């Protein structure tokens, strides 16, 4: 089954109605959920960042609701970095000033797992070779 990573910017925006990208993020999440888009890999770092942001802006109940929905949905896959990917993430963080540590870990995971597609609104990823950032509900595996 094809997969793509999902960044905090998309996950948070979909869950938080006041986010300026909420209406753009919803079709991405719905497409993942209904199978018109590839399954989503959610790194544990991304999940933590998203849940912390939701707790701050929308409250604990909203964060728990999102966590439950992600865990219960077979199209969302929570993954952790391997030791090698973590080492790569630290190196990328040191080398690429625009990337946050979580973003560097996303890139490292994608490189070590051979994944090229990332749903993200953060254009800092555009500076990284072999990462194809998707900012709309586009299926990169469907040529039609």
Question: Where do the protein language model's features map onto the residues?
Answer:
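Glycine/small-residue-rich phosphate/adenosyl-binding loop
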Residues: 55-71
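PIN/NYN-family metal-dependent endoribonuclease catalytic core
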Residues: 4-6, 27-57, 80
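Short active-site oxyanion
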Residues: 36-40, 75-77, 114-116
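Metal-dependent nucleic-acid phosphoesterase active-site entry motif
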Residues: 1-20
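Amphipathic alpha-helical segments within well-ordered protein domains
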Residues: 12, 51-52, 90
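Active-site neighborhoods of divalent-metal-dependent phosphate/nucleic-acid chemistry enzymes
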Residues: 78-117
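Acidic, PIN/NYN-like endoribonuclease modules and their adjacent C-terminal/linker elements
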Residues: 1-3, 112-144
């Amino acid at each position: 089954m094809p997969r793509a990573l999902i960044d905090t910017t998309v996950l948070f925006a979909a869950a938080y109605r006041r986010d300026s990208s909420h209406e753009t993020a919803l079709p991405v999440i719905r497409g993942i959920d209904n199978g018109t888009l590839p399954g989503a890999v959610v790194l544990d770092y991304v999940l933590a960042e998203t849940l912390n942001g939701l707790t701050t802006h929308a409250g604990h109940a909203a964060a728990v609701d999102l966590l439950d929905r992600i865990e219960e949905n077979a199209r969302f896959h929570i993954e952790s970095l391997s030791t090698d990917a973590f080492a790569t993430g630290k190196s990328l963080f040191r080398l690429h000033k625009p990337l946050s540590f979580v973003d560097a870990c996303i890139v490292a995971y994608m490189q070590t797992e051979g994944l090229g597609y990332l749903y993200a609104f953060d254009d800092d990823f555009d500076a990284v070779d072999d990462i194809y950032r998707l900012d709309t509900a586009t299926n990169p595996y469907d040529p039609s």
